[in-house]
Regions:
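Non-globular targeting/processing and membrane-anchoring segments
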Residues: 2-38, 157-346
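A short beta-strand-turn-helix
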Residues: 31-54, 77-80
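Short, internal strand/loop/helix patches
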Residues: 37, 102-140, 275
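Short active-site neighborhood of thiol/selenol oxidoreductases, capturing the structured segment around
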Residues: 43-67, 73, 86-88
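Loop/turn elements at helix/coil->beta-strand transitions in domains of secreted/extracellular proteins
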Residues: 50-54, 82-86, 112-116, 142
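Structural microenvironment flanking redox-active thiols in thiol-disulfide oxidoreductases
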Residues: 67-110, 121-125, 287
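Non-catalytic, surface beta->alpha helical segment in thiol-disulfide oxidoreductase systems
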Residues: 131-170
Length: 346
């Protein structure tokens, strides 16, 4: 689940199945629009890439599903970059702050993405491909034709097999390694697929459309709203308590207090919970995290969760990104509360 004061992501352990791409699928790949910002490479063109196999990967640095594909992309880049494969990462932002190039480049460095990147903040490449998904992969042959595509996670072996097929077409003498094994157990055939709470957006625009916020006060875009938690929580809905500014993309804390009395709460069923959050004022802020009314057990702690000397669990929000809050040892329904005593959590 993705929860943030921007949104909450309850991340499932699931894998997408390969789309049914016909064997004879063949569509000319569009040229990259002019005027794009390229990083980690000189500007590339489809015309100039003729003879290569090109994997165009649409990603977003706060997207958990994109992040889960990175180990496979890095493996393919390492194995096939000298055998004719060129990966082009197209970063198209979901949130306004993800348009900032510095944020994108820091994320690319942190994730170890070593291939050419396009900063697609105006959705130019996205529209050219008619794309609708993060992540999305389009595989292009030596003659510049899209021969395969996949949306979402999963189908890693099938995608790698298609890469090898097109590399063989480009160079029949090329020697290729075996298809890689699943990197995570949840990517293996037969892995359990749990019914998880869906992704939740807390901003007034998408949250209002989806009916995410369950408080009687509802959304009041542009205003600071004093919310009261009704106390009876339903699965998959968000409950706010305290003073929160309503914006299109986020709920933002506006009250500084001695104790963390303002909070966002949900009842969820998930193995993993992530949240996209940013420090609105550019300074680190602390968010306290409670699981079923108590600090998170260390066995269930996510990668970004910390503990103080009293065993209380918290996050330090020091940059706009996705924070991994919980990795539950056992799948179950739980309540999660994110509380703050500081200004500018959103």
């Amino acid at each position: 689940i993705l929860i943030a004061t921007l949104g909450i992501i309850l991340a499932p352990t699931w894998r997408a199945h390969a789309q049914a791409v016909p064997d004879d699928f063949k569509v000319e790949a569009p040229e990259f629009p002019e005027g794009l910002t390229w990083r980690q490479s000189k500007p590339l063109t489809m015309a100039g890439l003729k003879g290569k196999v090109v994997l165009v990967d649409f990603w977003e640095y706060t997207c958990v599903n994109c992040i889960r594909t990175f180990p496979y992309l890095k493996d393919w880049h390492q194995k096939y970059k000298d055998k004719g494969l060129v990966i082009v990462g197209v970063h198209t932002p979901e949130f306004h702050f993800a348009k900032e190039e510095a944020n994108v480049l820091k994320a690319a460095k942190d994730f170890g993405l070593g291939w050419p990147l396009v900063i697609d903040s105006d959705y130019a490449v996205w529209r050219t491909y008619g794309n609708r998904y993060w992540p999305a992969k389009y595989l292009i042959d030596k003659d510049g034709f899209v021969r395969y595509f996949h949306f979402g996670e999963g189908a890693y072996a099938a995608t790698e097999a298609q890469i090898q097929k097109l590399l063989k077409e480009a160079n029949p003498q090329v020697e290729l390694p075996p298809i890689g094994e699943a990197i995570r157990g949840t990517d293996k055939p037969g892995a359990v697929c749990y019914p998880v709470t869906p992704e939740l957006y807390l901003g007034a625009e998408r949250g209002g459309y989806a009916g995410t916020l369950a408080n009687r006060e509802g959304y009041q875009p542009g205003k600071v709203v004093s919310y009261k938690d009704p106390g009876n929580w339903e699965d998959g809905l968000v409950y706010a308590h305290g003073e929160w500014k309503n914006t299109n993309e986020a709920l933002i804390s506006v009250r500084k207090s001695p104790h963390p009395r303002d909070y966002i709460a949900i009842k969820d069923h998930a193995l993993e919970v992530n949240s996209v959050i940013r420090p609105e004022n550019g300074k680190p802020v602390r968010v306290w995290v409670y699981h079923d009314g108590k600090p998170v057990a260390k066995k269930d702690a996510g990668d970004d969760l910390q503990f103080d000397s009293k065993g209380r669990s918290y996050l330090i929000i020091n940059e706009p990104r996705m924070y991994n809050i919980v990795k539950n040892a056992v799948f179950a329904q739980r309540t999660l509360k994110l509380a703050t005593a500081e200004l500018g959590v959103g």
